[in-house]
A protein has these predicted regions:
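Mature-chain termini and adjacent capping regions
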Residues: 1-170
Length: 170
């Protein structure tokens, strides 16, 4: 009963922040913002320190938004250490700075490490910004510096595919 009450309070708080939170957060402080999760179902296992969310999962941290079918949050000492997103295609979007074009991406699996500001996209991954794109089976995106690394040297995964379009003449 106690866990259900905690879950209900968390869901109500999450919904409030999801609806009104985008007006409260500054882009440069995404990492300092809480991670807000909204889903159809939620369970927490205190013994394994895992929280599982399923069904139209939406997670938001500042200007970062991830949509997925399932999210598993791994906790360590009461803090979210790793978030694993899975689904038909897990999708993310971030506004890196005021006035900059959004960075978007998708993959079948995503891993987010909040303390390291690192998002890893695995299996059929693509990241876009403006008209440019990176595609690979493995992409790392440093959220703080907007640095994208694609491909794995130690595997036989597909090659990296990059599209760089010229700016339109004015």
């Amino acid at each position: 009963m106690k866990k259900n009450k905690k879950c209900l309070i968390l869901c109500i708080y999450s919904l409030f922040l999801l609806l009104y939170g985008s007006h409260l957060f500054a882009l440069e402080s995404d990492a300092e913002q809480p991670i807000v999760i909204d889903s159809d179902t939620a369970t927490y296992d205190d013994a394994t320190q895992l929280s599982t969310y399923t069904g139209n999962v939406i997670s938001v941290q500042g200007s970062i938004r991830v949509n997925s079918d399932k999210l598993v949050v791994h906790f360590k000492d009461g803090e979210a250490e790793k978030l694993v997103f899975t689904g038909k295609m897990a999708k993310f979007k971030q506004t890196p700075s005021e006035g900059a074009e959004d960075i978007t991406g998708e993959a079948f699996t995503g891993e987010f490490y909040p303390k390291r500001n690192l998002l890893v996209l695995i299996n059929n991954a693509t990241v876009w910004q403006g008209s440019g794109a990176y595609s690979s089976d493995y992409i790392e995106y440093d959220i703080k510096t907007s640095l994208v690394k694609a491909g794995e040297k130690a595997s036989d995964s597909k090659r990296v595919h990059v599209i760089i379009k010229p700016k339109a003449k004015q």
